[in-house]
């Protein structure tokens, strides 16, 4: 149980979250309280790079079972480096899981879809093929962290996260944020290939990790 001192979570996205004034963003999370606890109110905030608040909503979490809570955020300003902040508005203990902020405006209006401007730019190139999800990212740093496509389909909230092959480039951070949420998975990749008129070229792990992985090597696989 915490005093009301702004206890919560702060997420900067990838070097800031780009937000446009007047556009709508779907926020969701799964939450629960401890058995017998009173409901807990949470403030869902968007703050700019100067830490000024420009959008705020509240949700009330109740019950010991996991439930999904949603609100729509409509920022009052355009900001290239905003942050998503979740703070407690009342005392209590609450568990949070699968927090998401997603623009309603996506390429072809696909739920969980691509960023509209970048996807359109790619489509305008008229690519013949679309290769995904990459090369070394499929191998992982060892066999345990290889890309497993079956973990990237189905309900987004059930997809396990995985370390990113290149997250070591964020060694200056205590908590490197270059992980794979797998919110963009094989189904979405195939769907996007269709949307841009390109032949899908899926890359599948062959059971051999990157030979250049520090301490990983071939993991006993010849």
Residue ranges and their predicted role:
Residues 1-181, 197-203, 214-220:
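Extracellular and organelle-lumenal recognition/adhesion modules and their flexible linkers in secreted
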Residues 118, 186-190, 222:
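Generic structural signal for well-ordered alpha-helices
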Residues 194:
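Anion (oxyanion) recognition and catalysis
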Residues 207-209:
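Conserved radical SAM core fold
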